[in-house]
């Protein structure tokens, strides 16, 4: 293992329980987007707004500069040395829990190395992991070449109007990817 790999492994060991606790906290919000329940600053209803506030609170705790695009998208930045921007995009809204749950879908459980709960995979878990990945830079005093921006959407499951609103009001990132897992399982640590 080289020095960088060792540093990352130590960071993961150090923050892992905080990562899991933050995923658990974010999962606790039943953030099903309902445009009919819109209110100022909460275009997809209060539960989604509350989940967005939770995610932005996690980002602030980790040292990000945060802002809010009128409740459509949360923005968490680690300023870089240049004008370019590398971004991740995740979302804090979920589809309704539906039947088939043997446990409360909004009370995350750890079971035999697995994290179980609505949004753990899609997409609250990846949102938290994305924030902690960027926070590695802050913890180690690394100023990135590009601004690292974590976008936290609120309407991915219904119509993506969050992304359309963002693009109408902000420049496109120079590079964007989603860390959405896309698998039907979420292993705690392998």
List the model feature ranges, each with a label:
Residues 123-189:
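Acidic/histidine-rich catalytic neighborhood of metal-dependent amide-processing enzymes
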Residues 2-118, 144:
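Acidic/His- and Gly-rich active-site-bordering loop/insert found
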């Amino acid at each position: 293992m080289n020095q960088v790999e060792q540093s990352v492994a130590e960071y993961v060991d150090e923050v892992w329980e905080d990562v899991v606790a933050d995923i658990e906290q974010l999962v606790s919000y039943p953030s099903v987007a309902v445009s009919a329940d819109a209110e100022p600053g909460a275009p997809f209803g209060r539960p989604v707004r509350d989940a967005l506030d939770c995610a932005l609170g996690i980002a602030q705790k980790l040292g990000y500069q945060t802002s809010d695009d009128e409740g459509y998208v949360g923005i968490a930045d680690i300023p870089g040395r240049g004008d370019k921007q590398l971004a991740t995009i995740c979302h804090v809204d979920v589809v309704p829990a539906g039947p088939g749950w043997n446990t409360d879908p909004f009370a995350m459980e750890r079971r035999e190395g697995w994290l179980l709960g609505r949004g753990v995979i899609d997409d609250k878990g990846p949102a938290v992991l994305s924030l902690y990945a960027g926070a590695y830079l802050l913890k180690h005093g690394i100023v990135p070449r590009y601004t690292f921006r974590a976008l936290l959407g609120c309407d991915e499951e219904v119509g993506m109007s969050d992304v359309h609103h963002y693009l109408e009001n902000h420049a496109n990132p120079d590079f964007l990817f989603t860390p959405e897992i896309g698998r039907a399982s979420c292993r705690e640590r392998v």
